Amino acid sequence: MNKKLLCAVMFSTSLVSSMLCGCNSTSNDGKVEVELIQYKPEAVKAFEKIAENFNSTHSDIHLTIQSPNEAMTVLKTRFIREDYPDIIGIGGDINYSNFLDADMFMDISDFEVVNDIKPSYLNMDKELEFIPKDGVYAIPYVANCAGILYNKDMFAEHGWEAPTTWEEFNQLCQTIQSEGITPLYFGFKDTWTCLAPWNALAVGLAPSTVCSSVNAGETTFSVEYREVAEKMKSLLQYSESNPYAYSYNDACTAFARGESAMFPIGSYAVPQIQSVNPDINIDSFVFPANSDEKDNILNSGIDLQFSVMKECKNKEAVYEVLRYLYEDDTIQIYLDDQNAVPCKEGDFTLPSMLDGVKSYIEEDRMADFHDHHYPSEMSVDAMVQTFLMDDSSNAIDTFLSKFDANWIRYNRDLIKKVQDYIRGYNNEI
């Protein structure tokens, strides 16, 4: 295990006092013990049911699934102590990139379920590799989507249609405004909400490999993100008055109460909205960032995936656990509990609020959230909020220049590593 690399990705953590011993062993009753730690505590009920079902149907393996709060802190603390679980469940984001770069995961390309995963999601994991690697190191499980939620009953009452192009979207917003209704509610007081429309626009307007291309010295964000920034800024004309005064919870409440026709956010917001108004009829559409519908892409990212630790000693037992996790009926337990999107091909029941984007899911027209590649210390959400609040004539240029400068500042070592790899690769050709 590369401890030097692992320490590099560690942040300050508190030692966790009570931890189970990882890397499966045999219990007193002769069963192989398999430990899985996953990072979504909100899904604890689903995983309790999954573990119970598995253990009741397997006489030779005992599965323990932990769903702790602050799971990433728990995992990083355990890793530095070399106390590894067998399987971890994390998102497809920068944390996965860092763990993979630290050589922590087993190559599981021989696991048969890999062939059943939608190619878009497998590709997202490959794009998260800092340096290209042979093999498969995570199996995507479920995803979420982000675009625009809309009040389906309000649309029907007014005769509005979901737009499919940028021009249709602007015309719709103007029509809604003319009828005295707020088209969009943002809730930009919480800076992270600024990334919801940002990501949804970026997947349609910039390459999914933009961050890797910048690291390679092939382009800049000033070039690739200009149209994203321009269109993001233009959305403000359709928002609530002073969107920076209202939080995510405020936006969910306002949309639930019919104070806006649309809400640019991910499917993860639906339970919060329904807690205010259980009867609201919600659907969604892909953010129509382009003038041609064929160029639009659904913003969908891996919300949960499973990786096997390289130190795992009983691959056969772990694979049996994974086979059970990826059975259609098991996945459906999670989907029903969390309103998620399956990463596996199959005949699954999706929540109704995804009806408007279902064709994109079925056609595999999806790309990852760009912020999954952003280092957290760069605080891109706060940068976007500051940019949106800047009314100066050169706001876009200022923002893009800062994005380029900060990217270099916070990724200096990674950029050097990537460019050294490219030079070495080219010298070998």
Segments and roles (model prediction):
Residues N53, M104-D107, Y268-Q272, L304-M378:
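Mature extracytoplasmic/periplasmic domains
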Residues T175, N215-Y244:
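Glycine-centered hinge/linker elements that transmit conformational signals in sensory
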Residues K133-Y141, A146, N170-G217, S260:
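Extracytoplasmic/periplasmic solute-binding protein
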Residues N53, T57-Y121, D153, E157-H158, ...:
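Extracytoplasmic "Venus flytrap"/periplasmic binding protein-like
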Residues A156, Q332, E363-I429:
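Conserved C-terminal helix/tail region of periplasmic/extracytoplasmic solute-binding proteins
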Residues T77-R78, P85-D86, N115-M154, T182-F186, ...:
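A structural signal for short loop-to-beta-strand junctions that line the ligand-binding cleft
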Residues G91-A146, N170, I176, P197-N199, ...:
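Hinge/lid segment of periplasmic solute-binding proteins
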Residues S56-T57, H62, I80, D134, ...:
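Extracytoplasmic/periplasmic substrate-recognition and gating elements
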